[in-house]
A protein has these predicted regions:
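Bacterial Sec-dependent N-terminal signal peptides
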Residues: 1-25
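Generic structural motif
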Residues: 4, 13, 33-35, 48, ...
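N-terminal export/targeting and maturation segments
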Residues: 19-56
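Short, well-ordered, aromatic-rich surface patches in folded extracellular/luminal domains
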Residues: 22-35, 81, 90-150
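Short, surface-exposed coil-to-beta transition loops
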Residues: 37-43, 64, 102-105
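Short amphipathic beta-strand/extended segments with alternating polar/hydrophobic composition
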Residues: 42-45, 64-72, 115-124
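Short, well-ordered strand-loop elements centered on a beta-strand within folded domains, enriched
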Residues: 49-59, 115-121
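A short-motif feature that recognizes glycine-rich, charge-decorated loops
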Residues: 55-90
Length: 150
C-alpha cells in the first residue's frame, strides 16, 4: 500500500512539475524599422486583440499613419499559439543591424507568462532563416495577409 501511495504521489508531483514548467505565450510582436526614411510598422497579437500600425516619421505621405485594431477570439488565439514553436524561437541568434545601411531591422518579441524573448534579424543561416520566416508568415496570416510586407 505504501509503495502504491508513493508511486501515486510521485506521478502526481511529476505531472504537476511538467505542467507548471511549460511557458504560455501571452503576446507576440513584430517591429520593422526601415532605413533612412524611418518607416516603421508594428504588429501585436495577444489573447484580446490583433493590432497593426504603420507610420513614416519623415515625409509622412497621406496614406500613413495607418492603424488597424481587431478583436481576437480565444479559440483563434489558441490555434495561433499552437503554430509557434517557442523552443526553436529561443535558439535563434540575433543578426547585425541593417538599418544603418538603409536596410531594415526586423524584431520579433514573444512574451510568455515567465519571460520575454526578443530576437532581431535572426536569419543568418539556413535553419534560422527558415524558422524566422515561417514565424513571420504565421503572423501575417493572422492579419489576412500573404506576407508580412504586404
Amino acid at each position: 500500500m505504501k509503495k502504491l501511495l508513493f508511486k501515486l504521489f510521485f506521478a502526481l508531483a511529476f505531472t504537476s512539475i511538467s505542467l507548471h514548467g511549460q511557458e504560455k505565450i501571452q503576446q507576440v510582436e513584430v517591429h520593422i524599422f526601415e532605413g533612412m526614411a524611418l518607416y516603421s510598422s508594428h504588429y501585436t497579437i495577444n489573447f484580446l486583440y490583433k493590432e497593426f500600425e504603420a507610420k513614416q516619421v519623415m515625409g509622412e505621405p497621406a496614406e500613413l499613419p495607418k492603424k488597424i485594431l481587431l478583436l481576437n477570439p480565444p479559440d483563434k488565439w489558441r490555434v495561433f499559439t499552437k503554430k509557434i514553436n517557442l523552443n526553436k524561437f529561443k535558439k535563434l541568434r540575433d543578426g547585425p543591424s541593417q538599418q544603418a545601411f538603409d536596410g531594415e531591422n526586423e524584431v520579433i518579441i514573444i512574451k510568455t507568462d515567465k519571460k520575454t524573448y526578443r530576437k532581431m534579424n535572426a536569419y543568418s543561416n539556413d535553419h534560422d532563416r527558415e524558422v524566422w520566416y515561417d514565424l513571420l508568415q504565421i503572423i501575417a496570416k493572422e492579419f489576412g495577409k500573404k506576407g508580412i510586407y504586404e
